[in-house]
Amino acid sequence: MVSDASGWYARLDRECADRVQQLETWLDSWEEATRHGIPIAATLPNHWPTLPAGLLSDPGAVLDHLLARNEAESDGRSPRGAYATPAKFAEAILSDELKDTKEEVSKEPSAALSLSALPPGFRAYAQQFNQDVTEDNNNDTNIGEDGLQTRSGIAIPFADPSVGAGVFAARLIRIHADRCEKFTSEERKKDTLALLNGFQMLDNSEIAIKCARRRILIALSRCDLIDLDGKGGIGKIGRKEAEKILENTVQSGDALRGEWPWDEKPGLLVCRPPWLRIKDRFRGHPDGSELRKELSRQLRNTNKDGSRRFSTLRGNVNLYRLFLERGMQLVRKDGRVRMIVPDSLLREKSSIPLRKLMVEKNRWNSSWSFPENQRIFPGVSQGVLVIGITKGGETDTMTSYGPLHTNEITPQNGLANSAPTFDMIRKSWSSWTDGNWSVPRMPRDEYDRRRIVRAISELAEQPKLSEENNWLNPTGKPIRVRVGEIDQTNWSEEITDWKPGSRGTAFIRGTHFSTKGDDISIVHPAYVSGLKEDSVQRSQAKWTGSIRPKGKPRLACQAIVNAQLERRLRWAVVPSDCVLGNSVNFLELPTEVMERIAEEHGSVDKGLNWLAVHLNSETLDLWSRAWAANNNVNNYEIENLPFPKPNKIRSLAMQ
């Protein structure tokens, strides 16, 4: 799904620096190519760079990317980091959502029996048969006449509150056209008008709205549903009629701060909202700081009845969370929401209020989880999640699909039948997560899945590391998790390389944690001799600043881990004469605990090493990997780490 033609966009910028003009020219060329049934390369301006084969076959993907680049630059972000939703991915989501809906067939005369042609004794039976046929036909006719869906089986109104260049609308038209093949020309035209009038497309960018409207027209033309140059006719809508409809159904507006411009509630809402924090907005604007403050203030406003507009708004807000809550507000009862968001939503602490809303006040039906190495979006290193929610009620079971591979995406059916699944059943789910409704990260292998489930089930009821009065810490004083005292960015000038023969204070960072088998240790040139001069452990390993060592050994954990490593938790004892970077966390143990482990094991060092072995156990690492939100082993994760007695850990490992 990752395009290899990024160089073409850079060459285009040199030929045409105006990004809005790029979009207008592309749309004009695409429409002309559609009109004449020729490749778009034949209609592009001569001075534009030659279109690579990878982009030639999908003009919509180019439009999406051009718009994403324009919006990124206007917001002060780098256009290189812009990305768009792949069309096949969008179609797979729509196909999965619509695969269980009914599509009506063309109306044909009923197969009724003639009463006059039958003997009197059979007429009562024939009359009942004809009545049954009529009732069946009436039931079928109601499929599209209740106003809740088109005859092609698409729920309406169909909404997208962040429509962009209209990728979902365009793919929906394609699905609609395929389902209308058995209709008569007039039936197809009537149903297409119902679909267009049922659109509710919104975006806060006027440029995006213009692109979406044009793209929808082109999509209709490619499916032979519109006359681009005339008034229409049998089976085709006229262009002016379609444009008039789209003026009402594809509008500019802010779904988060403004009112929804349509009265009827959507039956289906599908969207890929922006993955941006408020603090990342308006970076290129001279009044960016004030604009961010105003945006934050408006989002925190209350409704007319005094309720908060967004009940899940917490801290430094990412906009995708607000779009997801807004989507659940907008759709009608039993309406559906499908949304593409980062897969960190499944486990991160800041999304707990949102997950509670999804589970306790709605039916969270499904989640598709793609790990970051699948690269659904070009240039984006985050994992991708597709959420499926039905409004109202509460969740009994949520089916989690994943970890998924890109080759398991099928535009016709959604996901391949071979995709791994796991059912999150409410009772055990609540017990596992203390009601915060996180979803564990599962491996694909069935044996490894069973190990994860066993570890979670056994550890869920154990006391937490930071809980007061646990078996290690009966004093009532909590065990604290702290970040290393040296911020590597702010103190970069005081951190130097450790050259052979150097003396000074050791600076410990994540790269100094070493794993050999089951043993975790600190490998630093201050404590380990024989390291090569160019070894990575010598780089940024010496501290020359004013902050002094703590003067006592500490139990530390690597905070930033490689997602590809088999082990996530890496605990080791660091010496008393070093300082720690902020890529390392450490435990701040109460004095009574330090004295106790020193007494029981002969010294503080030996006691901490004993505790490190316990915290490095395979069972605890399985737990940690299952609930990891990202590559950062943060304070919240460590504080909530189950903390059973060592003999309990050993018994779990032997099961």
Identify the function of each model-found stretch.
Residues 1-17, 21, 84-89, 142, ...:
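Signature of N6-adenine DNA methyltransferases within the class I
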Residues 1-194, 200-211, 254, 259, ...:
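Class I S-adenosyl-L-methionine
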Residues 59-75, 147, 184-192, 244-246, ...:
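Active-site-adjacent bridging/hinge elements
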Residues 65, 69, 92-100, 125, ...:
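Generic, well-ordered alpha-helical scaffold segments in large soluble proteins
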Residues 155, 198, 248-249, 266-267, ...:
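The start of beta-strands in P-loop NTPase/AAA+ ATPase cores
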Residues 211, 246-249:
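Extended charged low-complexity segments that act as oligomerization/scaffolding linkers
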Residues 321, 328-331, 374-376, 385, ...:
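Polybasic, glycine- and aromatic-enriched phosphate-binding surface used to engage nucleic acids
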